[in-house]
C-alpha cells in the first residue's frame, strides 16, 4: 500500500471518531482547546492500537487464507464501509439535553473503543497485504487525534448538520479503498 492509500485509509478510519467527537462537542457547554486535545489524544491512541491488534490476529490466521487475501481485505473494507454508511443514515441528531463542561475519561475511552472496532477489522485485512503496520497505525492514530480534536471544537456548530454525513463519507471511502485493493490485485487496470 502506497503513502497516498495509507493517508486516505487513515482519514477514512478517523471519520467515526470525528462524527462521535462532533456529537461530544455539541453536548458540551463550551468546549475548550484543552478538552478537545484531551479527547483527540484518547481517541488517537486507542485508534492507533486497534489496527495493531487486528493485524496480529490476521497474521496468526494468514497461512490459512493467503490465496484469498485480496478478497478478505476487500470484503472487510466493504462490509465496514457499508456499516458506516448505514449507521450514518440511521443516526439521529446529537442530543443537547444536558451540557457538561467536560466528558469523563471512561466515557471518552468507551466511545473511542466503539469507534475503533472498524480499525481493528481493517488491521486484520492489512495483515494480508504488504504494509508497514506501524506506520499505518501511527497514521491512523494521528489522523484520528486531529479529526477528534477538530470534531470537539466544531461540534457545537456542526453537530446537527455534519455528524451523520462524516460517517457516510468515511464509509464510501472505505469501500473505495477495498475496491482499489481488489482491482490492483486482480490486475484489472493494467
Curated annotation (Swiss-Prot):
Annotated InterPro entries: Mntp/YtaF, Put_MntP
GO molecular function: manganese ion transmembrane transporter activity
Top-rank taxon: Bacteria
Species whose genome carries this gene: Erwinia tasmaniensis (strain DSM 17950 / CFBP 7177 / CIP 109463 / NCPPB 4357 / Et1/99)
UniProt GO cellular component terms: plasma membrane
UniProt protein name: Putative manganese efflux pump MntP
The keyword Ribonucleoprotein appears for this protein: no
Keyword vocabulary terms for this entry: Cell inner membrane, Cell membrane, Ion transport, Manganese, Membrane, Transmembrane, Transmembrane helix, Transport
Keyword Membrane: yes
One Pfam family hit: Mntp
Localization annotation: Cell inner membrane
Bilayer topology annotation: Multi-pass membrane protein
Function: Probably functions as a manganese efflux pump.
Family: Belongs to the MntP (TC 9.B.29) family.
PANTHER family: MANGANESE EFFLUX PUMP MNTP-RELATED
TM regions (residue ranges): 3-23, 41-61, 65-85, 106-128, 142-162, 168-188
Amino acid at each position: 500500500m502506497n503513502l497516498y492509500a495509507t493517508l486516505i485509509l487513515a482519514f477514512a478510519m478517523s471519520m467515526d471518531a470525528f462524527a462521535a467527537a462532533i456529537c461530544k462537542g455539541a453536548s458540551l457547554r463550551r468546549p475548550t482547546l484543552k478538552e478537545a486535545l484531551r479527547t483527540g489524544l484518547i481517541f488517537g491512541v486507542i485508534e492507533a492500537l486497534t489496527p495493531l491488534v487486528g493485524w496480529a490476529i490476521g497474521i496468526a490466521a494468514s497461512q490459512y487464507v493467503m490465496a484469498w487475501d485480496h478478497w478478505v481485505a476487500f470484503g472487510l473494507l466493504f462490509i465496514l464501509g457499508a456499516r458506516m454508511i448505514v449507521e450514518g443514515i440511521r443516526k439521529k441528531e446529537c442530543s443537547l439535553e444536558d451540557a457538561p463542561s467536560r466528558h469523563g475519561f471512561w466515557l471518552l475511552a468507551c466511545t473511542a473503543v466503539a469507534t475503533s472496532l472498524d480499525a481493528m477489522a481493517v488491521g486484520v485485512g492489512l495483515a494480508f497485504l504488504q504494509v508497514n503496520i506501524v506506520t499505518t497505525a501511527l497514521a491512523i492514530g494521528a489522523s484520528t487525534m486531529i479529526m477528534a480534536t477538530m470534531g470537539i471544537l466544531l461540534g457545537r456548530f456542526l453537530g446537527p448538520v455534519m455528524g451523520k454525513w462524516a460517517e457516510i463519507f468515511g464509509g464510501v471511502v472505505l469501500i473505495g479503498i477495498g475496491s482499489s485493493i481488489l482491482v490492483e490485485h486482480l490486475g484489472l487496470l493494467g
